[in-house]
Amino acid sequence: TKILERKWMSLTKKLSLSLFSIFFLFFITQLHSQEKFISGKAKIVDGDSIRIEKHRIRLLGIDAPEMKQLCKDKNNEDYACGHLSKNFLISFIDDVKNLKNLKEVFCYYSEFDKYNRVLGECFVGPKRIYNLNQAMVLSGHAVAYLRYSDKYLKDQEEAMIKKKGIWSGEFIFPEEWRKKNK
């Protein structure tokens, strides 16, 4: 019986340690994955960045053409796709706000990028149903930024098929353009 007791005690200790480890990992994971939010009147910086009060927010999972970037339209004519991207984001937010009589943009975040910008998913509309990140990709004014997330890849495929925005002509992916134009 003493041998059985020792085995039982050993098993109980191992089980307790395992349960404690699982609980500890779960707690740490929950602590780090808790999203925070910022809300307020947004100032549009470019097609994938906004500012709410003192917070610089980079729209997570998307990459829009840079402000100085040119793309080619379906007629092979150059156009300022970076400016067009920014203007689309401004118009989209304004249209939803005016339609629904709303004043705020809500951004959920849990991390920062190397420039100390909030990486966020931003929404407007009643019950925050209009996802700005998704709208930019679906409209063809931004691409899915796979370095951070593949969440908008299906939206990008839809924009490509429908030849929306930058997909109607030729362009260099924003990340490539930045590398070439440092």
Give the ranges of each region predicted by the language model:
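Small beta-barrel nucleic-acid-binding modules, primarily SNase/OB-fold domains
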Residues: 4-6, 10, 17-21, 27-182
